[in-house]
């Protein structure tokens, strides 16, 4: 038979173990659902994870949009200046999607180096560009040094 103190210690130990297990599962689920942002230069250099979804952002390269006939499949390239990553997307593109436009795509990179997008988001305000995209474009020479017109007002 256990003394009251031993019973309390057993309950405390079980509660600590239960809370620890719940925290572990919550953090594991949270980690698997995170979508990190990468620039085309980071993807080209191999920094982006293969086999895991992430976000890529940049400008749609002019004359790179190719639509497959009788299909919703679209191929285009997204660039941050010196590097461009081919993107394949099947679905309806946003109304604001066009060449030279800033976009963010969600998906994963395949073995051939093509980004398989599951979602494409176009910027809504013509004067706004996500800070990560603007910094990458500025750093890589794809954006003028004074890019204040791209910042959210």
From Swiss-Prot:
The transmembrane segments are: 9-29
Asked if Translocase is a keyword of the record, the answer is no
Please give the residue ranges the record annotates as the region Disordered.
134-153
Cytoplasmic-side stretches of the chain, per the record, are: 1-8
Among InterPro entries, the record links this protein to:
CcmE, CcmE-like_sf, NA-bd_OB-fold
Q: Which Gene3D superfamilies match?
A: Nucleic acid-binding proteins (2.40.50.140)
Question: Carries keyword Transmembrane helix?
Answer: yes
Instruction: Please give the SUPFAM superfamilies that the UniProt record associates with this protein.
Output: Heme chaperone CcmE (SSF82093)
* Sequence similarity: Belongs to the CcmE/CycJ family.
Provide the protein name: Cytochrome c-type biogenesis protein CcmE
**Organism the protein comes from:** Methylococcus capsulatus (strain ATCC 33009 / NCIMB 11132 / Bath)
Q: Which gene produces this protein? A: ccmE
């Amino acid at each position: 038979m256990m003394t009251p103190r031993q019973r309390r210690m057993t309950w405390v130990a079980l509660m600590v173990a239960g809370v620890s297990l719940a925290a572990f599962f919550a953090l594991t689920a949270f980690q698997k659902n995170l979508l990190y942002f990468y620039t085309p230069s980071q993807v080209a250099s191999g920094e982006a994870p293969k086999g895991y979804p992430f976000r890529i952002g940049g400008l749609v390269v002019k004359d790179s949009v190719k639509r497959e006939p009788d299909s919703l499949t679209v191929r285009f390239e997204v660039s941050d200046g010196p590097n461009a990553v081919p993107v394949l997307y099947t679905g309806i593109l946003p109304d604001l999607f066009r060449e030279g436009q800033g976009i963010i795509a969600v998906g994963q990179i395949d073995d051939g180096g093509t980004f398989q997008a599951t979602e494409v988001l176009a910027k809504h305000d013509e004067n706004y560009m996500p800070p990560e995209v603007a910094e990458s474009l500025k750093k890589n020479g794809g954006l003028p040094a004074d890019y204040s017109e791209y910042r959210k007002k």
